Amino acid sequence: MESDCQFLVAPPQPHMYYDTAAAAVDEAQFLRQMVAAADHHAAAAGRGGGDGDGGGGGGGGGGERKRRFTEEQVRSLETTFHARRAKLEPREKAELARELGLQPRQVAIWFQNKRARWRSKQIEHDYAALRAQYDALHARVESLRQEKLALAAQVDELRGKLNERQDQSGSCDGGGAEGDDDDKRNSVMNASSSGLVEEDYVSCLAVPVVDVSEDGSAACGGSSYEYDHHLDYLGGGQLPDPFCGMPDLWETWPMVEWNAVA
């Protein structure tokens, strides 16, 4: 049973992210080798076609079979490739070709094509893994950004409440201080008023003592007045206290007038 693997396989298309200087150099070298192999194969096919024309049509069929690998050959090449990822030495290629009944150049070209396809698939796999990690990190960053905005909003709200509470506390303290000042001021005014009233009351009650001597003269408030017996009706010969406390009345109403009336 023949395999679909061709002897000459076209190089894989470069991936959109597999665009490096090393890859470009490998691809150019690969193309040069493929062109040389195609020229060599065309020359061999021309020689085989001439032989077929002279000896029959079997030569063309033999050339077509040379361009394909059998399933057993492909399986052996795949096993060797997965076991030996590194490039094979020329001696190893010759031994493998002799075991599989192939030419060393056929084995070298197959390994070269297989390695290019494997690199492309590996790069795609790595890119997919990195892309998944990037998407996860991007989602995490967005989540952290939203969380940061939410925390900033909470901080602003708490700061506003704290400032409002401090303002209210300051206004209450100011009002209390003003109230204390008013209370102190009222206390001082009340004390002053009480002092004035008590002073007036004490001055009114501070009545000088009237002494009546044997000669009939009376001393009241530090002044001497002649005692008149006609004043007995006022209270046993003693003047009321208010009159003693107000000497102006005595100046306005002298004792002479009282005697004249009597």
UniProtKB/Swiss-Prot annotation:
Ranges annotated as biased composition (Gly residues): 46-62
InterPro entries: HD, HDZip_class_I_plant, Homeobox_CS, Homeodomain-like_sf, HTH_motif, Leu_zip_homeo
Entry annotated with the keyword DNA-binding: yes
Molecular-function annotations in GO: DNA-binding transcription factor activity, RNA polymerase II-specific; sequence-specific DNA binding
Region (Disordered) residue spans: 44-68, 162-189
Entry function: Probable transcription factor.
Annotated GO biological process: positive regulation of DNA-templated transcription
A cellular component annotation (GO) from this entry: nucleus
Name of the protein in question: Homeobox-leucine zipper protein HOX24
